């Protein structure tokens, strides 16, 4: 998920024991196995009254329950349109803004934390958005079971948890097995857009994405921020302090 607010990110203290630490050795053999090293830590988080109301009132329409089957996404969205997957939308502000400015595209947001789901649903209600659907589940399992090969027109992964301690780098979301899964689900010519404010993670992203043979970089290395990606409050504050932000935009090679 986006880590704009450390309290929402669910990140443990740097030296805290993590729930699946003991299983790390086995998971590294097959990173997409169901006991793999996860890129997130599930925390309860406080759901506000407004978020709870949005979940109760709008969830039945806009939240798609996870199931290990392929849905009819045209039926889910009520139309056939370009489909963009967003992994880890945080509190949903960027998702809602992008969807509002791109009404011809449909957006599927995947987020594990309930406050973020409630926050995005609240924005959907306030702005009258109809082109967003949400799955509250682990994105890797959603990719494996709910999205068909060559079914996506784009993927957004903005500011995933950086796991900045070296011993936790294996928990970072952008790893070769996940990128291969994402690439397989992109249509030829479709794009994968990642953004991070951690230089070390940006370098890892560039290395991993460049190594995926079915993807090609749209820039020499890092791309200018595309106009459709909003600058978040957290990002704006960081830029004022001289912190960097790195965007990477890759495309699926033609068959």
From Swiss-Prot:
Protein EC: 2.1.1.33
Gene3D superfamilies membership: Vaccinia Virus protein VP39
Reactions listed under catalytic activity: guanosine(46) in tRNA + S-adenosyl-L-methionine = N(7)-methylguanosine(46) in tRNA + S-adenosyl-L-homocysteine
Annotated active site: 161
Pfam family, one: Methyltransf_4
SUPFAM superfamilies hit by this protein: S-adenosyl-L-methionine-dependent methyltransferases
InterPro entries named among the record's database cross-references: SAM-dependent_MTases_sf, tRNA_(Gua-N-7)_MeTrfase_Trmb, tRNA_methyltr_TrmB_bact
Binding annotation for S-adenosyl-L-methionine: 86, 111, 138, 161
Primary role: Catalyzes the formation of N(7)-methylguanine at position 46 (m7G46) in tRNA.
Protein's recorded name: tRNA (guanine-N(7)-)-methyltransferase
């Amino acid at each position: 998920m986006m880590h704009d607010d450390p309290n929402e990110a669910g990140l443990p203290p740097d030296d805290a024991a993590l729930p699946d630490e003991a299983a790390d050795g086995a998971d590294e053999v097959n990173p997409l196995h169901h006991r793999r090293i996860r890129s997130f830590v599930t925390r309860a988080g406080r759901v506000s009254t407004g978020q709870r109301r949005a979940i109760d009132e709008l969830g039945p329409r806009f939240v798609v329950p996870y199931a290990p089957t392929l849905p009819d996404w045209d039926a889910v969205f009520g139309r056939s349109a370009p489909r963009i997957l967003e992994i880890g939308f945080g509190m949903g502000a960027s998702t809602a803004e992008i969807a509002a400015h791109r009404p011809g595209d449909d957006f599927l947001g995947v987020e594990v934390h309930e406050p973020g789901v409630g926050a995005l649903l609240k924005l959907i209600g306030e702005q009258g958005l109809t082109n967003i659907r949400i799955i509250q589940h682990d994105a890797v399992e959603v990719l494996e079971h709910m999205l068909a090969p060559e079914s996506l027109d784009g993927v957004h992964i903005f500011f995933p948890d950086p796991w900045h301690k070296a011993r936790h780098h294996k928990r970072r979301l952008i790893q070769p097995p996940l990128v291969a899964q994402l690439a397989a689900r992109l249509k030829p010519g479709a794009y994968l857009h990642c953004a991070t404010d951690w230089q070390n993670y940006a370098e890892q992203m560039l290395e991993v994405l460049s190594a995926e043979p079915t993807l090609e970089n749209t820039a020499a290395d890092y791309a200018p921020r595309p106009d459709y990606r909003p600058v978040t409050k957290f990002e704006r504050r960081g830029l004022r302090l001289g912190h960097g932000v790195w965007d990477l935009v890759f495309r699926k090679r033609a068959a």
